């Protein structure tokens, strides 16, 4: 359905600033320019002009830039008015544009129009919001990579490999008289392996990009008085949790976010797990288990002097099997033993002192490893949870396809489903409901 109306919004953040921008997009942009400025400035040239109201009274003087479509952000005629950034002045200028026939833009509507006009694909459109909301330098750089199209290019490369494989398989189905035994030739299995390897590489980078965006949820769990709050304070670099020798001091979950090499860690300190008749403490313990349901990694603390006992094993048994876990043997300062990290039966054990900080660097590095952190950060692009879900769905269809190599029609159908799932990332195959959900989370003016 073609867009026939013109939208306007304040594109800069709320509050006072040196410069404020009102953005207009749509067929009436040129007429609004003529009414506010007296004439439409030359395309893509910054012009210093007077902005006037309906009575020709001066609103402000500033910079006006006119971008005729399709060579604009939205693909439509776009006008940007840059004035002094006072909130009242911005509202006067926006009101003037609305009087001239524009309507107030909805959140994300400018970027949505850019997507609908093929100026951006969906992954790039989402990256616009991610660039704005990036909390770290690493997150900002990865979001810019997505906005520039690096993520989309990787997805399109995978799509092309899938298309090539589908064409080959379906040609064999459509022309059986040619008697091409593509299965015995091994070419299909080889091509499928190439697609799967490419998918895994993209998934690893997307997962790190997602961690840059969302952060890693780290939950500290263990019996009372094993040093969970001390470890949280050590990781945070400040006292965010109360520490006393009294068991059961922490009765509720305490949350704090820190950054290690650009990765945000959302750390949750929890109530010690034990049998208790204290109603308040019981509520805290219930919250501990709820926090673990959303954890990205669990730190299981034990007293280094006592080691892992029945209580710790019972805690371990209740944790999700897929959840990454690290055993923290705390209080090595009391045992006069050095810090160390070791692997035992597929589990990571770190010996440290939360009180002195000795060995905490080993934990920080292990958390970065779990997050998939790469020292260079090269090639990492911003990815959202929906992208990981889509990539997982592609992986599932490819795994099913691998088991149906001798059933050509079923094999071809799994390839089609894999391609459809992959296409949801860039928006070639996406529902209107999903588009509404994505763009509604943008700020107004983008």
Curated annotation (Swiss-Prot):
(6S)-5-formyl-5,6,7,8-tetrahydrofolate binds at residues 23, 80, 119, 446. It holds the Pfam family TrmE_N. GO terms for biological process: tRNA methylation; tRNA wobble uridine modification. GO terms for molecular function: GTP binding; GTPase activity; metal ion binding. Its main location: cytoplasm. Residues 215-372 form the TrmE-type G domain. InterPro entries: G_TrmE, GTP-bd, GTP-bd_TrmE_N, GTPase_MnmE, MnmE_dom2, MnmE_helical, P-loop_NTPase, Small_GTP-bd. Keywords: Cytoplasm, GTP-binding, Hydrolase, Magnesium, Metal-binding, Nucleotide-binding, Potassium, tRNA processing. GTP binds at residues 225-230, 244-250, 269-272, 353-355. Belongs to the TRAFAC class TrmE-Era-EngA-EngB-Septin-like GTPase superfamily. TrmE GTPase family. This is tRNA modification GTPase MnmE. It comes from Methylobacillus flagellatus (strain ATCC 51484 / DSM 6875 / VKM B-1610 / KT).
């Amino acid at each position: 359905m073609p867009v026939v109306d013109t939208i306007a919004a304040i594109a800069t953040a709320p509050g006072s600033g040196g410069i404020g921008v009102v953005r207009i997009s749509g067929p009436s942009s040129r007429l609004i320019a003529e009414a506010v400025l007296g004439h439409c400035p030359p395309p893509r040239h910054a012009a210093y002009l007077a902005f006037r109201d309906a009575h020709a009274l001066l609103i402000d003087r500033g910079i006006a830039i006119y971008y005729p479509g399709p060579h604009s952000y939205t693909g439509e005629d776009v006008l940007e008015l840059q004035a002094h950034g006072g909130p009242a002045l911005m509202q006067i200028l926006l009101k003037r544009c609305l009087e001239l026939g524009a309507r107030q833009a909805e959140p994300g509507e400018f970027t949505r129009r850019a997507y609908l006009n093929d100026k951006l694909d969906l992954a790039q459109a989402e990256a616009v919001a991610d660039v704005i909301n990036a909390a770290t330098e690493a997150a900002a750089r990865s979001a810019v990579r997505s906005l520039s199209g690096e993520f989309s290019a990787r997805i399109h490369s995978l799509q092309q490999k899938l298309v090539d494989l589908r064409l080959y398989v379906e040609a064999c189905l459509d022309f059986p008289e040619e008697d091409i035994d593509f299965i015995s030739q091994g070419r299909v299995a080889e091509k499928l392996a190439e697609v799967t390897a490419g998918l895994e590489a993209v998934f690893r980078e997307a997962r790190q990009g997602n961690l840059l965006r969302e952060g890693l949820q780290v939950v500290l769990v263990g019996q009372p008085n094993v040093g969970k709050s001390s470890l949280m304070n050590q990781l945070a670099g400040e006292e965010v949790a109360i520490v006393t020798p009294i068991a059961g001091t922490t009765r509720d979950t305490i949350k704090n976010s820190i950054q290690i090499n650009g990765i945000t860690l959302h750390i949750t300190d929890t109530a010690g797990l034990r049998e208790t008749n204290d109603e308040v403490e019981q509520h805290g313990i219930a919250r501990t288990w709820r926090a673990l349901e959303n954890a990205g990694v669990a730190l299981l603390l034990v007293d280094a002097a006592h080691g892992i006992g029945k209580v710790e094993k019972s805690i371990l048994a209740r944790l999700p099997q897929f959840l990454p876990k690290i055993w923290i043997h705390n209080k090595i300062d009391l045992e006069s033993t050095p810090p160390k990290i070791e692997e035992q039966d597929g589990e990571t054990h770190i010996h440290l002192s939360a009180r002195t900080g000795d060995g905490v660097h080993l934990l920080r590095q292990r958390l970065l490893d779990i997050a998939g952190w790469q020292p260079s950060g090269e090639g990492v692009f911003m990815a959202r949870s929906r992208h990981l879900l889509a990539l997982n769905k592609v992986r599932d269809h490819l795994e099913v396809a691998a088991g149906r190599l001798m059933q050509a029609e079923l094999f071809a159908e799994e390839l089609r489903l894999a391609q459809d799932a992959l296409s949801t990332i860039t928006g070639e195959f996406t529902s209107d409901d999903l588009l509404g959900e994505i763009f509604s989370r943008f700020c107004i003016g983008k």
